[in-house]
C-alpha cells in the first residue's frame, strides 16, 4: 500500500513564561492508504496534540510546531498557511472530535451544518447540498433523515450526534479521517455500532483512519496497526496482532495487563504504578523509567532511541538494543 500520511520528527511545544514545554517530542509514523492506525496511550501522552498538529489547529491552543514534517501525499502541511489549511481541512483531512455536543453548533440545524461543508468545499448549490446531506444521514443509519435535517443538536442523543459528526466528516470523501476518542461518551452497544459504521464507510471510500484512543478494546476491534505513545514520544509501533500477542515495550505490556479479564478469578486489577510525568518535569533518562519494573541503571540517565526490532516493528527501549537497528 502506498503512503498517505508521513510524520517525521514532529516536535510540538507549548510555552510557559517563554520556557518551551515539549508536548510532542520527535514523533515518527506513517499511514498507508486505506489503513486504520490507532494512536494509544494514557491521558497526557501527546495523542491529541499530535492530531491537532496534523490538522493545523494546535496554534489556536497556544502550541507551536518547532521541528519536523507532516506530509500528506506530496504536500508538506507544516509549510501551510491558514488559508491553505482551510482548503484541505474538512475536505482532504477530516476530524471527529471527542465530544459531539461541543463540536456541533447549537444554534444551527443539523442540515445547515452538513450543507455548509458541501457548499464551501464542493461548490454545490444549496438544493444539491441538501439532497447530498439527506443521503449522508441515511448512510450513517438515520431512517428519518429529512426530519433529522431540521433538528438542533440538543434534540439528539449522544450516539445520534456522533453519527452526524461522522456524516459531516465523510461528506467530502476525505483521504484521511482523524477520530479522537470517537466512542468515549457512548454506551457499549452504541460504541460497537459507531465503530462498525466508521469501518464500513472508510472501506467504501478507501479512507485512511487515525484512531486516537486509550481503549484497547476499541483498538483490537478497529485497527490494523498500533502506535503507542508515552510522554510525547512513540515507544512502540506494531501490527495489532503482534502488539496483543507479544508486546515489546514494558509500557505496552503494562497497558495490556491492566485490562480486566472476564474469565478466571481476579484478586485485584493490575495497574502501572505511579503517574505520567508532566511535560515540564520529564525524567533525564527514559521517560518511563520511574514506573518501569524492568528499568536498568542506564535507563535513569540515558534516553533510548527508537529501534527497528528483528520482528520488523519499532520500539524505544534499551532491552532490545543488541537485537535492533537504530532508526535514522
UniProtKB/Swiss-Prot annotation:
Instruction: List the Gene Ontology MF annotations in alphabetical order.
Output: ATP binding; ATP hydrolysis activity
Give the subcellular location. Cell membrane
Q: What are its GO biological-process terms?
A: establishment of competence for transformation; peptide transport; protein transport; sporulation resulting in formation of a cellular spore
Disulfide linkages recorded for this protein, renumbered to the chain, are none
> Which UniProt keywords are given for this protein, alphabetically ordered?
ATP-binding, Cell membrane, Competence, Membrane, Nucleotide-binding, Peptide transport, Protein transport, Sporulation, Transport
Q: Name one Pfam family in it.
A: oligo_HPY
Name where it mostly resides.
membrane
What is this entry's stated membrane topology? Answer: Peripheral membrane protein
Which GO cellular component terms are attached?
plasma membrane
Entry annotated with the keyword Cell membrane: yes
- Domain ABC transporter: start-end pairs: 5-256
Q: Quick one: which residues bind ATP?
A: 41-48
Q: Has the keyword ATP-binding been applied to this entry?
A: yes
- According to its UniProt record, which protein family does this protein belong to? Belongs to the ABC transporter superfamily.
Function according to Swiss-Prot or TrEMBL: This protein is a component of an oligopeptide permease, a binding protein-dependent transport system. This APP system can completely substitute for the OPP system in both sporulation and genetic competence, though, unlike OPP, is incapable of transporting tripeptides. Probably responsible for energy coupling to the transport system.
PANTHER family given in the database record:
DIPEPTIDE TRANSPORT ATP-BINDING PROTEIN DPPD, OLIGOPEPTIDE TRANSPORT ATP-BINDING PROTEIN APPD
Q: What is this protein called?
A: Oligopeptide transport ATP-binding protein AppD
Q: What is the species listed in this Swiss-Prot or TrEMBL entry?
A: Bacillus subtilis (strain 168)
Amino acid at each position: 500500500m502506498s503512503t498517505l500520511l508521513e510524520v517525521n520528527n514532529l516536535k510540538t511545544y507549548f510555552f510557559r513564561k517563554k520556557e518551551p514545554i515539549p508536548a510532542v517530542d520527535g514523533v515518527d509514523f506513517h499511514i498507508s492508504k486505506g489503513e486504520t492506525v490507532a494512536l494509544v496511550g494514557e491521558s497526557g501522552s501527546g495523542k491529541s496534540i499530535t492530531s491537532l498538529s496534523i490538522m493545523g489547529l494546535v496554534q489556536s491552543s497556544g502550541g507551536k510546531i518547532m521541528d519536523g514534517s507532516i506530509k500528506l501525499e506530496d504536500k508538506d502541511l507544516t509549510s501551510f498557511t491558514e488559508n491553505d489549511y482551510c482548503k484541505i481541512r474538512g475536505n482532504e483531512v477530516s476530524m471527529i472530535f471527542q465530544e459531539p455536543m461541543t463540536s456541533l453548533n447549537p444554534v444551527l440545524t443539523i442540515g445547515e451544518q452538513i450543507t455548509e461543508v458541501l457548499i464551501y468545499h464542493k461548490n454545490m448549490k444549496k438544493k444539491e447540498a441538501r439532497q447530498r446531506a439527506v443521503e449522508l444521514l441515511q448512510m450513517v443509519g438515520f431512517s428519518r433523515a429529512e426530519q433529522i435535517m431540521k433538528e438542533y443538536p440538543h434534540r439528539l442523543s449522544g450516539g445520534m450526534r456522533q453519527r452526524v459528526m461522522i456524516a459531516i466528516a465523510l461528506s467530502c470523501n476525505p483521504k484521511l479521517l482523524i477520530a479522537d476518542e470517537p466512542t468515549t461518551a457512548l454506551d457499549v452497544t452504541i460504541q460497537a455500532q459507531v465503530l462498525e459504521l466508521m469501518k464500513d464507510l472508510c472501506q467504501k471510500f478507501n479512507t485512511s483512519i487515525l484512531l486516537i484512543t486509550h481503549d484497547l478494546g476499541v483498538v483490537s476491534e478497529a485497527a490494523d496497526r498500533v502506535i503507542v505513545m508515552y510522554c510525547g514520544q512513540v515507544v512502540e509501533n506494531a501490527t495489532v496482532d503482534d502488539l496483543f500477542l507479544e508486546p515489546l515495550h514494558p509500557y505496552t505490556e503494562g497497558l495490556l495487563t491492566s485490562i480486566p479479564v472476564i474469565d478466571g478469578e481476579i484478586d485485584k486489577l493490575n495497574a502501572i504504578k505511579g503517574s505520567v510525568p508532566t511535560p515540564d518535569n520529564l525524567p533525564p533518562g527514559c521517560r518511563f523509567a520511574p514506573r518501569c519494573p524492568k528499568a536498568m541503571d542506564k535507563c535513569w540517565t540515558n534516553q533510548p532511541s527508537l529501534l527497528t526490532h528483528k520482528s520488523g516493528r519499532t520500539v524505544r527501549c534499551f532491552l532490545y538494543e543488541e537485537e535492533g537497528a537504530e532508526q535514522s
